[in-house]
Amino acid sequence: MKYLYLEITSRCNLRCEMCFKQHWEDEEGDMDYDLFLKILDDAEKFPELKMIYFGGIGEPTVHPRFMDMVREVKKRGFALGISTNGTLLTDEMLKELAELGVDLVYFSMDVLPTAQNVVTLGHILAGVTAEKIKKLVKYREEVGTHKPSIGVEVVVTKENYKQLPELARYLLNLGVDAMLVSNLLPLTPEQVNDIVYDGSIDMTPIVNELYKIAHNGLYIKLPYFELKTERVCDFDENKVAVIRWDGEVVPCYRFLHTYREYIFGREKKVNTYSFGNVREKSLADIWTSERYTWFRFITKNYLYPSCTDCSLRDACDFVKTTDIDCWGNEPSCADCLWSRRIVMCPIPQYNFGKFL
């Protein structure tokens, strides 16, 4: 295991329509602190572990002991990454993140922070998030370590795709290190009309402009904007495990919760899938279990069908859920837009002495 993702809470202070959280069937909750400490104890058994990452489908800063958790991770010597909308981070918290040497913070922002830029699907309060980024840049300069690295996650829709180059320039001038661009994964039939990877939009000019901006020092990670044959599971390739707030160990974000998604307009039920609970077993026992090891072997070698471009997909019952595919794999990754790099996995890369 090289990356361990912790969903320390599934609650959030915002209500963004494109978020899984608005459409899943699961209950909300916070990871209790004793369980968190047990997970850190278990994590110390993995010598190749590069980073612990506070993420999942919740807002980590909502957790009442968020800063205690940050301090504990850094006290134990782990690298720490955090995904956040940033709106609850106070000046004191931002300053302490820099002083503690938190390694990476990714903020969510989908448009330029101007009054006229209001999107119906994207993350709201872009102006507030931008101010938090400015302050974090200031505090890390005062500390003098250039930590944390700062990234921004952007979800592309028909509402904001034309703004991507301008947003990239803005982030570069703001002092941001990385920009992760991902496509919208529709969670309602209406959202299908907002995707840009169905051939309705020519993204080539936008992509070319973004590459030019990247040469100026902004690390930009882009998705594909059309369906391609190649499949790459970043969660599996980077040896990632994800632990839900209640202790369930899942292989990736896609299987973290139960919800409905729309693959090029076709409805699919995604059912959460766990390989065990760290309340009952050690993380090492779960990670090395026969079932989890076999799953990683299957996904690593892509020994599963491709439902997305199968000619039988509209007449097949297997594609209706992620429970099983026509090759007998449980759960099924055969319809995953994350492995197609249409939806981007938020896995950091270690480049030039820092995580991005």
UniProtKB/Swiss-Prot annotation:
Pfam families hit by this protein: Radical_SAM, SPASM
Keywords: 4Fe-4S, Iron, Iron-sulfur, Metal-binding, S-adenosyl-L-methionine, Tungsten
Transmembrane domains' residue ranges: none
Residues given in the record as [4Fe-4S] cluster binding sites: C12, C16, C19
PROSITE patterns listed in its UniProt record: MOAA_NIFB_PQQE (PS01305), RADICAL_SAM (PS51918)
GO molecular function: 4 iron, 4 sulfur cluster binding; catalytic activity; metal ion binding
Keyword Cell cycle among UniProt keywords: no
Cysteines paired by S-S bonds: none
Ranges where the Radical SAM core domain occurs: 1-214
Cofactor note: Binds 1 [4Fe-4S] cluster. The cluster is coordinated with 3 cysteines and an exchangeable S-adenosyl-L-methionine.
Cofactors, names only: [4Fe-4S] cluster
Function: Involved in the biosynthesis of a molybdopterin-based tungsten cofactor.
Family designation: Belongs to the radical SAM superfamily.
Protein name: Tungsten-containing aldehyde ferredoxin oxidoreductase cofactor-modifying protein
Organism of origin: Pyrococcus furiosus (strain ATCC 43587 / DSM 3638 / JCM 8422 / Vc1)
Lineage: Archaea, Methanobacteriati, Methanobacteriota, Thermococci, Thermococcales
